[in-house]
Design a protein with these regions (language model features):
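Long, low-complexity, compositionally biased intrinsically disordered regions
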Residues: 1-134
């Protein structure tokens, strides 16, 4: 689920060339476009909790915020369905957005406390999309 070193180098540049954009669109399709838009709209947050120095990445999606463990996991439905169950993809656009944001240092840094982290995790770890609506 990680980007290749070549991809990381391309994304680390200040400006993407048209060739770079074409490459990523061909490889990742709409996911790249959505991920880049999320980054450009400043919807990626890096929380740093004190005193533990725990880092948590959040990507704001269309309907809620998603907890992202870089290169590993996302709490969104797409990750569960496309990556875990059907294995038709190796990442959702939230994971891609987090990697792009980190490489480009284009994210909001949020300082908070460990006490607040416990409360936030209750919301972030929600998987109520799995529940059947009554």
């Amino acid at each position: 689920m990680a980007l290749s070193l070549i991809e990381e180098k391309k994304l680390s540049r200040e400006n993407l060339t048209q060739n770079d954009i074409d490459y990523f669109r061909k490889k990742y399709g709409k996911k790249f476009v959505r991920a880049l838009r999320v980054v450009e709209e400043n919807k990626v947050e890096k929380y740093q909790f004190k005193p533990s120095d725990t880092i948590t990445w959040i990507v704001k999606g269309r309907s809620r915020q998603y907890l992202v463990i870089p290169k590993v996991y996302c709490t969104c439905r797409s990750f569960y369905q496309e990556v875990v169950i059907s294995r038709e993809s190796n990442m959702c656009y939230h994971l891609l957005a987090q990697q792009i944001a980190e490489l480009r240092a284009q994210y909001e840094l949020v300082d908070s406390t460990d006490t607040k982290r416990r409360k936030l995790y209750v919301e972030w770890r929600r998987t109520d999309w799995l529940l059947i609506q009554h």
